[in-house]
Amino acid sequence: MAPSSLGQLILGYQLIWDKSRRPAAMQLFMSPLQDEPAEVAHFLRALQQTWSGQSPTLILTPLSADLLMGALEHNTPDGPWLCVQQDLLGEAGMIDLMRRAHGRGVQLLWRGDPGERPDAAMAPLFGRIIISLTPGEALAGAHMSLTHNRDTPSATNPVLPGQIVEAVPSRLMADHCLDQSAAWGIAGWPSDDVLLSHKYQPVQPSHQAIVKLLREIDKDVALDLLEHTLAEEPLLAYRFLRLTNSAAMGLRKEVESLRHGLMLLGLSRFKQWLMEQMPQATDEPDMEPVRTGIVMRAHLMEYLLDAGDEDTLRREVFLTGMLSQIDGLLGEPLRDALHRLPLSERVNGAILGRSGPYAPFLELASALEYPHMTNVAGLCETHELHLDDVNRTMLRVMAQLQH
């Protein structure tokens, strides 16, 4: 992708989760870097080259009238879905462009403020709508979830089948939307509330992840694949690092990476340890988006700091991103969690002090998560990074996500 398009845009992402708590879509927000118009047509062509059939559905959400008009004019039926902001509908010529895009087969979505819904006359143009609930609507939905039979329809339900619900405040409301109201998806995930529900019952590793690792060991897969699978379960990875650095293991060297630990421990002892984790492991669907979000940030860091062929550096950068949110899974202060591991000053400095060589990339990976994208341009300038490189990297990581 050329700097002519990616260097003109500030991008941020938000995952949309389906009933199985898997990514149904990737919502990509875009704002202009400056007042001058961006080359939207080129950006759309480049997006289609990056996105694959294995990637989640892409929902493009322009946050300015010029970007939205450009997307409506140039998008194709096989391009990304286009999300239209309610507050941009009043722009001159916008409705006409929407009708023409709809006529070409472009999938349009509507998005508004809490409590808003699309005008009845405009509703036929939209394949789906993204709603935000008012506090009263969220309370009504939570009350229904607690008191009503899920098979009993209610005219007071603020969520209709097929809708996408944004900024859901609680785990209870997320379950109501996806499991009881047949919402198409949840935009963003109430991770803080899900973790808060574990205040008196610690989070446990994923049973599914442990089973997958055991199968891979039995199949004698490559060590790289084992390392990748272990890294996809942050809590299990943290416990593994604790294990390999414990006095009970008697290993002669400090273990600073998952791969190093696997090599020193050996697959037989690793398998035995996994079996010991099985009784406490759980399959808790609401935790999957939390884990995925942590791993996404880690992968963004890994790719933002282009380590080239330096695998050791790449692993340390990934570990930095993963451990930056481990406190939520452990239910304890981040400093306490990190001090139990023999981490380098580069890792500790980035996470605890926002200092050192990895800190800029941790800050950027966090800022790319909507709604923090307004900080991206300033961070690029502060740390002398190119915005087009940052955007290109983010899109590459997003496209690799499996739905």
Which residues make up each language-model segment?
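Short, solvent-exposed coil/turn linker segments
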Residues: 15, 63, 69, 76, ...
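Residue-level detector of functional hotspots within protein domains
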Residues: 2, 7-14, 44-46, 66-70, ...
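Generic structural signal for short, solvent-exposed loop/turn connectors between secondary structure elements
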Residues: 31-43, 113-118, 131-139, 219-220, ...
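Conserved alpha-helical "signature site"
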Residues: 55, 142-403
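The catalytic core of metal-dependent phosphodiesterases that act on cyclic dinucleotides
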Residues: 74-192, 313-316
